[in-house]
């Protein structure tokens, strides 16, 4: 229901000519401003509603390649990367989802995000964010930066990202396990040469342990990694 409401709101906001550009600018102005009560440690998560809404709307808008290109030209990636380190989990998760939405299928956005250091930041979130909502969003963004993107894959390998992906297979959180298994399956399918380093880093016992766990969405892709 929330997704349907968001799509309807975006459609209404984009009814006129040039409306998408104006809406991108409006949302970025929201994100550039401080969250209400940001200095108060006791502040509840609900106070970030304006920023969360702006991130969600931007992610919806940036599913259009034209809007994603415009978003990058407005400096949106720089704003989003700062929010990856925000103290409140919904903003970190929303920033990661927006980054993935913008980079998906847009080489220019991928290259810009990689040049800005998005991948090490996302891997840091994937390694150690304490909130279970955030790592799956980070993994989505990582996938959008490394699949069919040679520079992104090169960075992933250099940063030890393959080991991080393998470790995510052992997460206690099913959504993260499923995303990690899917990405590893895709990478092995697209780049068979990755089999050797992944096996060396313990992929086989990790994938086997995944298959022995309670059945969930990760099993099919976990089996796929073993069959590669």
Q: What does each of the following model-derived ranges do?
A:
Residues 7, 21-28, 51, 119, ...:
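A general structural signal for well-ordered alpha-helical segments in protein cores
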Residues 27, 79-81, 121-125, 164-166, ...:
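Buried hydrophobic core positions in alpha-solenoid tandem helical repeats
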Residues 36, 64-67, 108, 119, ...:
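Flexible helix-coil junctions and inter-repeat linker/turn elements that act as hinges
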Residues 14-19, 33, 50, 57, ...:
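Eukaryotic helix-linker segments that join adjacent hydrophobic helices
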Residues 1-41:
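Intrinsically disordered, low-complexity regulatory regions
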Residues 1-5, 39-59, 88-103, 115-116, ...:
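Alpha-helical solenoid repeats of the armadillo/HEAT superfamily
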Residues 14-19, 67-74, 109-116, 134, ...:
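Short, hydrophobic/charged alpha-helical patches characteristic of ARM/HEAT alpha-solenoid repeats
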């Amino acid at each position: 229901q929330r997704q349907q409401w968001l799509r309807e709101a975006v459609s209404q906001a984009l009814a006129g000519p040039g409306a998408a550009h104006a809406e991108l600018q409006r949302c970025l102005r929201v994100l550039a401003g401080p969250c209400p009560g940001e200095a108060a440690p006791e502040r509840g998560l609900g106070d970030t509603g304006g920023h969360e809404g702006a991130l969600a709307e931007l992610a919806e808008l940036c599913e259009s390649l034209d809007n994603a290109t415009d978003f990058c030209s407005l400096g949106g990636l720089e704003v989003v990367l700062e929010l990856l380190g925000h103290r409140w989990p919904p903003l970190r998760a929303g920033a990661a989802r927006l980054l993935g939405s913008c980079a998906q299928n847009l080489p220019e956005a991928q290259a810009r995000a990689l040049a800005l250091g998005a991948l090490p930041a996302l891997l840091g979130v994937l390694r150690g964010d304490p909130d279970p909502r955030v790592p799956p969003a980070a993994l989505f963004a990582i996938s959008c930066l490394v699949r069919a993107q040679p520079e992104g894959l090169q960075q992933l390998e250099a940063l030890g990202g393959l080991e991080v992906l393998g470790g995510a297979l052992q997460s206690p959180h099913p959504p993260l396990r499923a995303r990690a298994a899917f990405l590893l399956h895709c990478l092995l399918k697209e780049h068979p040469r990755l089999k050797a380093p992944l096996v060396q880093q313990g992929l086989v016992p990790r994938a086997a342990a995944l298959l022995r766990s309670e059945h969930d969405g990760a099993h099919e892709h976990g089996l796929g990694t073993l069959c590669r």
